[in-house]
Amino acid sequence: MTAKWEKTSGSQGVLTYEAPAEAFDKAVDAAFKTVVKDLNVPGFRKGKLPRPMFNKMYGEEALYQDALDILYRDTIQGAVEEAGFEPIALENIDVDGTLEKGKPVAFKVTFVVEPEAELGEYKGLEYEAVSTEVTEDEVTAELEALQQQGAELAVKEGAIENGDTAVFDFAGFADGEQFEGGTAENYTLEIGSGQFIPGFEEQMIGMTAGEEKDVEVTFPEEYHAENLAGKPATFKVKLHEVKTKQVPELDDEFAKDIDESVSTLDELKASIRERLEAGKKQEAEGTMRDQLVEQATANATIDVPEVLVEQEVDRMVQEFGSRVSSQGIDLNMYFELTGTSEEAMREEMKEQAEERVKARLVLKAIADKEAIEVSDEDAEKELEEMSKLYNIAPDQLRTMLAPQGGLETLKGDLKFRKAIDILVENGKAK
């Protein structure tokens, strides 16, 4: 078998190869064995029609399409490997000439392939520098957030105020009927958190323990339960307890409780400042790299096939599904709660997906032009660093990465990172 690959455009080409006659004959035999299983012919048991009788009744040509499918399936991988290219998607299959038993079959197969980016300027690009200075207000805000995290709830005498926590029973009624999912006992709610529908929490302000009240609200038009959307409702509320936050004092003891490595509040503040600075530097580095990749991509010329964009959208939907799944929600539930659909999400993701594909192709072109190489040793070193970062044994991490391509995928990521490093080394702040 002699296979030849010829590109016809930036993202498409034709593979031509000839499958030998004996391979086609075997495929015809295999097709007969498959087809005859389902044949019901009077005078013969199901699946037992002799081959000569089949040929007489239907003609051997009736097997050729199935045989062609079998032959293609059995030969295409070898032809692709011999021609030395990597297809992304199948576009079309043609056969030159007439199919005939005892003769070779000449395939002409059109594939979509990854296009090559035509690079523009990618060195000497300018980026907007981001300040990494940490202000005193930012340190104070972080300190107060830690203080709030250490707060404890204590029972409070008197009326509910915004920010207090209420423990109460409620039962919801619409059109005079109690509705499903609108009842709870000893429910805990922070007033002002916005967890309940608009107007509910505000009407609880001023209530005291033991008080009962009818809370009148209207469900939003876009509420996920269609039978309640836009309807007025009454919630019968009985308040059991009012709790308020008691925050710890900002002193040396508080500092030691938060961070065992410090002894005083001033040391904690210094530690917070150092952490915030490190975070800002990392964020600034990421922003700079993103800006440079965006510019290099904008300067390049790329013909991105639709199939690549759709594949990237598939990845993005999968990534999003994994994120919401970690919060205990599957995608179908998410679509129901938000009133959206997968089709709408995919359409919204398309533009970003295309930009991601373009950026990847540009970085690949830069890596090729700059002759960037990533060795197995580089990948192993990166694996070691990742195992330390995520506190996972290297072998376990290797197993987890295997379905995504393992070390080869890791090497590809490293190559892209090195390509961005070249943009950074040759870039400059405005």
From Swiss-Prot:
Catalyzed chemical reaction(s): [protein]-peptidylproline (omega=180) = [protein]-peptidylproline (omega=0)
Domain PPIase FKBP-type: residue ranges: 163-248
GO annotation, cellular component aspect: cytoplasm
Coiled coil start-end: none
Its EC number(s): 5.2.1.8
GO biological process: 'de novo' cotranslational protein folding; cell division; chaperone-mediated protein folding; protein transport; protein unfolding
Keywords: Cell cycle, Cell division, Chaperone, Cytoplasm, Isomerase, Rotamase
Domain of life: Bacteria
Broadest EC class assigned to this enzyme: isomerase
A GO term, aspect molecular function: protein folding chaperone
InterPro entries: PPIase_dom_sf, PPIase_FKBP_dom, Trig_fac, Trigger_fac_C, Trigger_fac_C_sf, Trigger_fac_ribosome-bd_bac, Trigger_fac_ribosome-bd_sf, Trigger_fact/SurA_dom_sf
Subcellular location: Cytoplasm
Its job: Involved in protein export. Acts as a chaperone by maintaining the newly synthesized protein in an open conformation. Functions as a peptidyl-prolyl cis-trans isomerase.
PANTHER family according to UniProt: TRIGGER FACTOR CHAPERONE AND PEPTIDYL-PROLYL CIS/TRANS ISOMERASE, TRIGGER FACTOR-LIKE PROTEIN TIG, CHLOROPLASTIC
Free-text domain note: Consists of 3 domains; the N-terminus binds the ribosome, the middle domain has PPIase activity, while the C-terminus has intrinsic chaperone activity on its own.
Family of the protein in this entry: Belongs to the FKBP-type PPIase family. Tig subfamily.
Name recorded for this polypeptide: Trigger factor
Gene giving rise to this polypeptide: tig
